[in-house]
Curated annotation (Swiss-Prot):
O-(pantetheine 4'-phosphoryl)serine: residues bearing it: 39
Residues forming coiled coils: none
Domain of life: Bacteria
InterPro entries from the UniProt entry: ACP-like_sf (IPR036736), PP-bd_ACP (IPR009081)
Post-translational modification comment from the UniProt entry: 4'-phosphopantetheine is transferred from CoA to a specific serine of the apo-ACP-like protein.
Species of the source: Mycoplasma pneumoniae (strain ATCC 29342 / M129 / Subtype 1)
UniProt KW keywords: Fatty acid biosynthesis, Fatty acid metabolism, Lipid biosynthesis, Lipid metabolism, Phosphopantetheine, Phosphoprotein
Function: Carrier of the growing fatty acid chain in fatty acid biosynthesis.
Pfam family membership, one: PP-binding
Protein name per its UniProtKB record: Acyl carrier protein homolog
Gene3D superfamilies: ACP-like (1.10.1200.10)
Ranges of residues in domain Carrier: 4-79
Source species taxonomy: Bacteria, Bacillati, Mycoplasmatota, Mycoplasmoidales, Mycoplasmoidaceae
């Protein structure tokens, strides 16, 4: 799966959950806190991504995710590990 496809899915989730910030390529490196995305918002995105892609984030790894680019990279990694 390509990063762009993952970003599109995250954008769909954010829109469905009425996020105030538009999540697109222009904000990939901005910290979540600058985007006004709090822990509850992140939790809902993570749960939706786990269901959508049949993946499971490790709690320790979640604590290290600081921006959208890192989240996309981790989703891509977890998807690639499913076939192993």
């Amino acid at each position: 799966m390509q990063e762009r496809d993952i970003l599109l899915k995250i954008k769909e989730i954010a829109k469905a959950k009425n996020f105030k910030t538009e999540l697109d390529e222009s904000v990939l490196q901005k910290p979540f806190r600058e985007l006004k995305i709090d822990s509850l918002d992140m939790f809902s995105v993570i749960v939706s991504l786990e269901k959508e892609f049949d993946i499971m984030f490790e709690d320790e790894k979640l604590m290290q995710l600081n921006n959208l680019a890192e989240l996309i990279a981790e989703v891509k990694h977890l998807i690639s590990q499913k076939g192993v």
